[in-house]
Amino acid sequence: MPRQPTPQSSFPQLNISRRQGLTLLGASLLGGASWAQTGTPWATIEAKARGQKVFMNAWGGSDRTNAYLQWAAGEVSRRYGVQVEHVKLTDTAEAVKRVRSEKAAGKLTGGTVDVVWINGENFLTMKRESLLFGPFAESLPNFQYVDVVGKPTTRSDFSEPVEGLEAPWGMAQFTLYADRKRVPNPPRSMAALADFARANPGRVTYPRPPAFIGTTFLKQALLELNTDRSALYKPFTPEALARASAPLWAYLDALHPHLWRAGKQFPQTPAAIRQMMADGELMVTLTFNPNEAANEIVAKRQADSVYAWQMAGGSVGNTHFLAIPFNTGVAEGAQVLINFMLSPEAQARKADISIWGDPTVLAMDKLPAAERAQFGAKPLAGQVESPAPVILEPHGSWVDPLEREWLKRYGQ
């Protein structure tokens, strides 16, 4: 029987080949065939991929992202003869749960998830439970262009070594934006943001964790409020959480009464706070995409006077990745798709403010001149004016306990 897509799949039948890894022998026994593992020439991988169908599991909450994936589907179809179906997720954990269940049921090949857009705690879970195919990423032909020096999070996912088990796809960093006419002097630290909220009650908020940017807001505060961050980059322990999070809860206890609806309610999604900003309900808003304000200006949802900034002492940032589950039956098609996503052409289109505006993982100085020219060099209104240093994410094991403690304290 053919594999069936899970609910919420889109553009079905388009012709194209999205938080310790397996050993080479283990992956082989579980049904994968990888260039990295077998030494097979890339042309052979492409030939085997032709005619395969790939179920790509990726967050489906953005029209821009969905449209980009549809474009990529068409391109890979035309060039490589592989099919893809975008399985739209509301939470990446859905796909992780599905792969885990298949492994428990003994389904060691022909799984229902072929590619997953992933990082952080979800990657950590899949790596620890040997749910990932590979290593494969650093043997993809287009990996040669990845900026592994200037963007070290391309090899470290929430402080967990990637080890070739997922391929970097895009960059993210905690960013704020506001209308310069209303906020001429932006708050450039979490302490300054609290002062701003006190001076402008009801005009600041953040999404309710576990919404991603809400959790990122917690991590930014956690990192800024701890001068010794060493414990945050080690696997979570209850004792470490109690020590490190004490200043965070004190900060939030003082901040919440000055937030939107006095901190008794929180928006559910990033889209909700974007709309509140567009409506003038908020004076400052948060994002994990440094180009979001520019996107909003181009889409005529924000005024040209909107500008973006990051925290002066550094903003938490990471890379998001594409991974292949251990039990895919179409490893060749999955690798062809991911390799295309790493191409200068696909990365430049993804970085285009008018298309998506997701920052590239590539190093401009590694690209031939023609490919480098595809990336816009002129800054646009709303783009971050003075990018801050990246603060590495805490270890991925901190995310769930941090969210649970927030919900226990503030989620009622």
Spell out what each predicted region is:
Residues 1-16, 23-30:
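N-terminal secretory signal peptides
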